[in-house]
Swiss-Prot record:
Higher taxonomy: Eukaryota, Metazoa, Chordata, Craniata, Vertebrata
Listed GO MF terms: ubiquitin binding
The keyword Nucleus appears for this protein: yes
Keywords: Cytoplasm, Cytoskeleton, Endoplasmic reticulum, Golgi apparatus, Nucleus
Domain SEP: 175-240
Entry's localization field: Nucleus; Cytoplasm, Cytosol; Endoplasmic reticulum; Golgi apparatus
Biological role stated in the UniProt entry: Adapter protein required for Golgi and endoplasmic reticulum biogenesis. Involved in Golgi and endoplasmic reticulum maintenance during interphase and in their reassembly at the end of mitosis. Regulates the centrosomal levels of kinase AURKA/Aurora A during mitotic progression by promoting AURKA removal from centrosomes in prophase. Also, regulates spindle orientation during mitosis.
GO cellular component: centrosome; cytosol; endoplasmic reticulum; Golgi apparatus; nucleus
Name of the molecule in the record: UBX domain-containing protein 2B
Transmembrane segments: none
Family according to the record: Belongs to the NSFL1C family.
Disordered: annotated span: 1-97
Chain ranges of the UBX domain: 286-363
Composition-biased stretches (Basic and acidic residues): 50-63, 73-95
């Protein structure tokens, strides 16, 4: 057309490119009547729909943006471990940290846990990964595990003549056997004191055990040998301090310095002494010095009785028969312990026989 207007075909192409909303508007314009409110709403709705379709087409194209919280990503640095969706309770329960100087090298560090069972479980798990085996398996593979080991330490080689002196022979390096007991409230070594899981020094000790290394605390015990560490799981129990196995000497001794040493015996309980006295009453003269005689009978029992030093050996025999009537028809003798001497002359007093405060043995003939 002369006025430069577009042809009908060109107008149709523009309408298809602009969308149905524009076509609807031009149709109303060509009809000669103004568009109604409904027509405007339909045109706007179709316009928004077209915009949404274009946005969806753009989102389908690949991008180089990484998802920050994708579960499939590999932890490469300390920063990627900070997960905002992790609750505070999880952090308090068991913390893990990653420390590294590059994307391909680093060290994972376990923080202190408030759950002892998890500490024990992780300790057994990682120790097993470093070569530790359960005790039943170790006992099956090692036939000498339960056998007692003979002494193999150092000792003295005695001289074979008066000119040659004794010399000390050093033994081979000995292995150190240590038992690590894991309790609910801590751990202990052998029968030692309780050590808390929360102590940083103790945590470092357990970390060394996890890695299969000798802890610093145990390195001083190793002199060229190795440490055999056994672990026992007692996480269901609270630590109880073990009783001391040391027992003081409670036997008898001999006072040296005379031909017939005086026996220094341990004090007996009052009940034991009273029982011996009640078995056979012995008349005691308080104006005369007294002594106490311990009698070891042939049946393994013993009697303890006070006598005057003027009592005779025959009085001891009578006391035995009165206390144990079964020996009345038995032939026996009385013998000293050191030196071993039979008391044949029973008419001697206890002082004359030099058996004050001693032990007398009954021997059957």
């Amino acid at each position: 057309m002369a006025d430069g207007g577009a042809s009908p075909a060109q107008q149709e192409g523009e309408m298809s490119a602009a969308g149905p909303g524009l076509r609807r508007e031009r149709q109303h314009r060509g009809s000669g009547r103004p568009p109604s409110a409904r027509d405007l709403q339909l045109a706007l709705a179709e316009l928004y729909e077209d915009e949404a379709k274009r946005q969806s087409l753009r989102s389908d194209k690949p991008t180089t943006t990484k998802m920050s919280n994708s579960k499939g990503l590999k932890i490469d640095s300390f920063r990627s471990l900070r997960k905002p969706e992790r609750s505070m309770s999880d952090d308090k329960e068991n913390q893990r940290f990653y420390s590294g100087d590059s994307e391909y090298r680093g060290l994972q560090i376990w923080g202190a846990s408030n759950n002892p069972s998890k500490i024990v479980a992780e300790l057994f798990k990682e120790a097993k990964e470093h070569g530790a085996v359960p005790l039943d398996e170790a006992s099956r593979t090692s036939g000498d595990f339960s056998k007692a080991k003979s002494f193999s330490g150092g000792g003295y080689r005695l001289g074979d003549s008066s000119q040659k002196h004794s010399e000390y022979i050093y033994g081979e390096n000995q292995d150190v056997q240590i038992l690590l007991k894991l309790w609910r409230n801590g751990f202990s070594l052998d029968d030692g004191e309780l050590r808390s899981y929360s102590d940083p020094i103790n945590a470092q000790f357990l970390e060394s055990v996890k890695r299969g290394e000798i802890p610093v605390d145990l390195q001083r015990l190793v002199h060229g040998g190795q440490v055999n560490l056994d672990m026992e799981d007692h996480q269901e129990q609270e630590y109880v301090k073990p009783r001391l196995r040391f027992k003081a000497f409670s036997g008898e001794g001999q006072k040296l310095g005379s031909l017939t040493p005086e026996i220094v015996s341990t004090p007996s309980s009052p009940e034991e002494e009273d029982k011996s006295i009640l078995n056979a009453p012995v008349l005691i003269d308080d104006s005369v010095p007294a002594t106490k005689i311990q009698i070891r009978l042939a049946d393994g029992s013993r009697l303890i009785q006070r006598f005057n030093q003027t009592h005779r050996i025959k009085d001891i025999r009578d006391f035995i028969i009165q206390s144990r009537p079964a020996f009345a028809t038995t032939d026996f003798v009385l013998v000293t312990t050191f030196p071993n001497k039979e008391l044949t002359d029973e008419s001697l007093t206890l002082r004359e026989a030099d058996i004050l405060n001693t032990v007398i043995l009954q021997q059957l003939k």
